[in-house]
Amino acid sequence: MINRKTARLIALYGGLIFVSTVAVLLARQFSLGPERPAPNFRTFGPAGAPIMIEEYSDFACGACRAAAGKLEELLKVYGDGIRLQLKHYPLVNIHPWSLDAAAYADCAGEQGKYKEYAALLFENQDKWGEAKEKPKEFEAFAGGLKLDWKEMQACSAAPRTRQRIKLEMAEGDMKNVNATPTFFINGKRAVGPAQLVEQARKFDGILKAAHGRHVPPSGI
């Protein structure tokens, strides 16, 4: 049986742990500053859309590839009703080339071909995702899209490119992202393609409430 003195000590110790945890989280948030929007080439839809989707994704993740197709379909069905921001969360411990893939995709974006390069990364995961040496596919994809490979190499190695990705990873950590893809749909978490589709079933109601607009069911 715990006596009163022991109970007080336990409560005090627990309180100190709580305060310390909050202090660490606040310090991390302060060091990150305000959450940064994704760059324009990873942002789709109007700023005032009723449905706001933020995705944390990894190009070497099979579930992320499946989700990319679902997102594309949702954008086609709901159009300007959705604002989508794509953010990087490469799981570098299990996908050694995913950070490089994210960097090259961003650099393709700076040359106007983010979506096309991202699609090639997803479609060819089995060719580069678990390569033992730096994948040649990164250059091959650039060549197929007529991108300037030297410029992409310089861009990929630039501190600003890597820092942007790592800041997004840190933001994901702050939101307790621990799997990909993780979505925040109007602030509500969804993990994986199945939960994305589950949340998408509510989109008609959200749009109707926002604009009195009815959209035929997507069927996904």
For each feature predicted by the language model, list its residue ranges.
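Short, flexible loop segments at the rims of nucleotide/cofactor-binding pockets, characterized by
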Residues: 31-33, 62, 160-161
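Short gly/ser/thr-rich secondary-structure transition/capping motifs
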Residues: 33-39, 163-166
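Residue-level signal for pocket-adjacent positions within structured domains
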Residues: 36-39, 123, 185
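Membrane-interface motif at the C-terminal end of an N-terminal transmembrane signal
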Residues: 22-35
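Short clusters of hydrophobic/aromatic residues that line enzyme substrate/ligand-binding pockets
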Residues: 42-44, 128, 190
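C-terminal cap of thioredoxin/glutaredoxin-like
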Residues: 1-23, 56, 139-220
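A short beta-strand-turn-helix
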Residues: 35-51, 76
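Structural alpha/beta surface segment adjacent to cysteine/selenocysteine redox centers
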Residues: 49, 54-143, 148, 173-178, ...
